[in-house]
UniProtKB/Swiss-Prot annotation:
It is found in: Cytoplasm. This is 3-isopropylmalate dehydrogenase. The gene is leuB. One of its GO terms (molecular function) is magnesium ion binding. Catalyzes the oxidation of 3-carboxy-2-hydroxy-4-methylpentanoate (3-isopropylmalate) to 3-carboxy-4-methyl-2-oxopentanoate. The product decarboxylates to 4-methyl-2 oxopentanoate. Substrate binds at R94, R104, R132, D217. Its cofactor is Mg(2+); Mn(2+).
Length: 345
């Protein structure tokens, strides 16, 4: 099991190292046979190679079975031309591997309901996974353009595009609570009708998973009023962009949010948070999202579902016992990671 490690910039190297400590502990205990190779990416790669996604890193990604990414960017590189900024490396990475499904879990951990902007009784038990189609829809549809008098974009999906992201959602639901909500706007958009029909066809191949449909406007309301009732949510690119950001505020801190991007090539696992250059090197970064991204890697890249859940349980206990500064505690990166490791033992 070969992993390409891309620590990136800012707090990226610190939180990635925390995740690697957890993976090494599991490897030692379970004999997983994990192998790691570290490559420069983002701003660090610009400094070394003049571009954010250089050829050695590209080759390393191609040869790996999974990518564990830290974070990219920072004020040091903000003045560069857009095509060579660190963030452009992320787009190039995703495109090079044809990563068409973005998975964004949002979980309110037991005992941390107070962090959520919602009332505690509403936030309690929230554990939702947003599966967003990543490479199609209105962001990429043609024709598109703008004149002095008007502007236009095209919302377009093919059947294979919808089918493949729907399968990702149903497969994920099988490992969770076996319930999928498909989100569209089928009452006014032909693309929505097509999306709904195609997801229903895919769903027939998963008789053990319940399927429900919601219009996107109603879904936004439900995610605020009763988020705990949802398991897996699958939707198109633009709706997924909006709903995943809405869901991301439910736990109360970006430091708790991992993500995965899956597709035809090497899958990428990374925290949702940015590089936080203001706290880089201070040893106070919350590594939870990076550790949970590693757990997602175990599950989605290597099929080690039970070990992934074991990591999640250890993190949940550590958050209560030694919370990091962004959650109102005082545990630095190393101290928090040590608590996670203790609960894994």
């Amino acid at each position: 099991m070969k992993v390409a490690v891309l620590p990136g910039d800012g707090i990226g190297p610190e939180v990635t190292e925390a995740a690697l400590k957890v993976l090494r502990a599991l490897d030692e205990a379970e004999g997983l046979g994990l192998a790691y190779e570290v490559f420069p990416f983002g701003g660090a790669a610009i400094d070394a190679f003049g571009e954010p996604f250089p050829e050695p890193t590209r080759k390393g990604v191609e040869e790996a079975e999974a990518v564990l990414l830290g974070s990219v960017g920072g004020p040091k590189w903000d003045g560069l031309p857009r095509k060579i900024r660190p963030e452009t490396g992320l787009l190039s990475l995703r495109k090079s591997q044809d990563l068409f499904a973005n998975l964004r879990p949002a979980k309110v951990f037991p005992g941390l309901e107070r962090l959520s902007p919602l009332k505690e009784e509403i936030a309690r038990g929230v554990d939702v996974l947003i599966v967003r189609e990543l490479t199609g829809g209105i962001y990429f549809g043609e024709p598109r353009g703008m004149s002095e008098a008007e502007a236009w974009n095209t919302e377009r999906y093919s059947k294979p595009e919808v089918e493949r992201v729907a399968r990702v959602a149903f497969e994920a639901a099988r490992k969770r609570r076996k319930h999928v909500v498909s989100v569209d706007k089928a009452n006014v958009l032909e693309v929505g009708e097509f999306w709904r029909k195609t997801v229903e066809e895919v769903g027939r191949g998963y008789p053990d998973v319940a399927l429900e449909h919601q219009y996107v406007d109603a879904m936004a309301m439900h995610l605020v009023r009763s988020p705990a009732r949802f398991d897996v949510v699958v939707t198109g690119n633009i709706f997924g962009d909006i709903l995943s950001d809405l869901a991301s505020v439910l736990p109360g801190s970006l430091g708790l949010l991992p993500s995965a991007s899956l597709g035809r090539g090497t899958p990428v696992f990374e925290p949702v948070h940015g590089s936080a250059p203001d706290i880089a090197g201070k040893g106070i970064a919350n590594p939870t999202a990076a550790i949970l991204s590693a757990a997602m890697m175990l599950e989605h890249a290597f099929g080690l579902v039970e070990l992934a859940r074991k990591v999640e349980d250890a993190v949940a206990k550590a958050l209560l016992e030694t919370p990091p500064p962004d959650l109102g505690g005082s545990a630095g990166t190393e101290a928090f990671t040590a608590t996670v490791l203790r609960h894994l033992a």
